[in-house]
Amino acid sequence: MKITLIIPTYNAGSLWPNVLDAIKQQTIYPDKLIVIDSGSKDETVPLASDLKNISIFNIDSKDFNHGGTRNLAVAKTLDADVIIFLTQDAILADSDAIKNLVYYFSDPLIAAVCGRQLPHKDANPLAVHARNFNYSSKSIVKSKADIEKLGIKTVFMSNSFAAYRRSVFEELSGFPEHTILAEDMFMAAKMIQAGYKVAYCAEAVVRHSHNYTPREEFQRYFDTGVFHACSPWIQRDFGGAGGEGFRFVKSEIQFLLKNAPFWIPRALLTTFAKFLGYKLGKHWQSLPLSTCRYFSMYKSYWNNIQYSSSKEIK
């Protein structure tokens, strides 16, 4: 099994040396590593150059897209059986992270696997709870049969640390070329629809979290709303996340009451920001383009958007 590891980068910052060191320590080392950089001004590219089997490709930051840029990187490696994606701020937690992730491909019907994400050591209480809630200590393999029980969680996938079977990835035409985010969920949904299975491997662990402000959470959920407005078939076929959202808020309040009660007002403000951002994102076509760009975390996405581009992405 030939493995390629792909990392999109842009000014990777202080965590980057730790990310690279963790890759070097893997018991299964990738046959090829690709860093696709969007014009970093720091030491991102020079530091990556020391990795074994590394290829570095440069693109203009204005050309970056969560789907299209990853597709471009996949096209640079023609002989890989498995493609692993890692983000520049995700640190492999132990030397067997890649080994445990790719183990699932021994089942020919499993087309994608994502790993568990634990919070960084500097994570605030909201970030700690989010990772503990969303990333269980129990592994699971999901198929069409799980949709009734799991709903949209059936197609949960995160390219912060995820692997894809190359043959199925290409069979389904890769990620959408122009998407604001959630290219990983999009692909997992296509795989499930096509009769394949996707897995969550709790034994393949990375450290990855964000201490987002309420404003940043608003922006992130605005983008999530835009994604679902552009790809409504996912919620139509797999269900919404309403019930899961209520469970998250209840769990968060319980966690904070026990561990960090002074964070409850911040949590309530953040919850409102998420809700408002998502609702506005779902109706982005009713907003001026300048407002969409202002509300969005991924601002360059809006450079080539027109209101006539309401065609469903599928």
UniProtKB/Swiss-Prot annotation:
Pfam families: Glycos_transf_2 (PF00535)
Keywords: Glycosyltransferase, Lipopolysaccharide biosynthesis, Transferase
A single GO BP: polysaccharide biosynthetic process
Record pathway: Bacterial outer membrane biogenesis; LPS O-antigen biosynthesis
InterPro entries: Glyco_trans_2-like (IPR001173), Glycosyltransf_2 (IPR050834), Nucleotide-diphossugar_trans (IPR029044)
Protein family per UniProt: Belongs to the glycosyltransferase 2 family.
Gene Ontology MF: a single term: glycosyltransferase activity
Role description: Rhamnosyltransferase involved in the biosynthesis of the repeat unit of the lipopolysaccharide (LPS) O-antigen region. Catalyzes the addition of a rhamnose to the galactosyl-undecaprenyl diphosphate intermediate.
Keyword Glycosyltransferase: yes
Enzyme Commission designation: 2.4.1.377
Glycosyltransferase among keywords: yes
Catalytic activity from the UniProt record: alpha-D-galactosyl-di-trans,octa-cis-undecaprenyl diphosphate + dTDP-beta-L-rhamnose = alpha-L-rhamnosyl-(1->3)-alpha-D-galactosyl-1-diphospho-di-trans,octa-cis-undecaprenol + dTDP + H(+)
Top-level EC class: transferase
Superkingdom of source: Bacteria
The protein's name in its UniProt record: O-antigen chain rhamnosyltransferase RfbN
